[in-house]
Amino acid sequence: LTEVAAFLFHTQGGIAMFRHWRADIRAVMERDPAARSTLEVALCYPGFRAVRRHRRAHWLWNHGMKLLARIVSQRTRRRTGIEIHPGATLGEGLFIDHGMGVVIGETAEVGDNVTLYQHVTLGGTGKDVGKRHPTIGNGVVIGAGAMVLGPFRVGDGAKIGAGAVVLKQVPAGATVVGNPGRVVRMF
């Protein structure tokens, strides 16, 4: 508990967490025309609440308090409908819009300024050991119901269409649609 208090009120970790929170609120304000104030985002956006609580759980996970991290994560899932494993790494400016049903697996890595819509899964494909979830680059947009499954990279600025099932690497700037996912456009 002393470690947690030191983290939140005293350390570089606490400062970084608040910096991430500000970036996450700013992302919602910039990307959602329905967002009217930062207070509204902080109180009424379940995607923001899930990411904020994940950042706490992730810190606990990385400091050996894995059970407590899982408890925070599961309470967040029950309250928001968004499941983010505390081992997952999230960049700044993540916006989960209409987040019900979003799942982000343990070894997933999400870059900065990423947008995820409802029912997105960043998951694995089985019981592999080690890295088994995707790495999402900066500025990626993943549409509603898309599944990105496996230990590969989605390049910076890529767009994954609604309902796509992506099982292999996506180049930077590509647009991927369909099941199985296929590149239909490159920038």
Task: Label every PLM stretch briefly.
Residues E3-D32, F95, G111-D112, H119, ...:
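Soluble, non-transmembrane catalytic domains of enzymes that act on hydrophobic metabolites at membranes
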Residues T80, H85-P86, G91-E92, D97-E106, ...:
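Left-handed beta-helix
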Residues L1-T80:
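Terminal amphipathic alpha-helical/low-complexity segments used for targeting or macromolecular assembly
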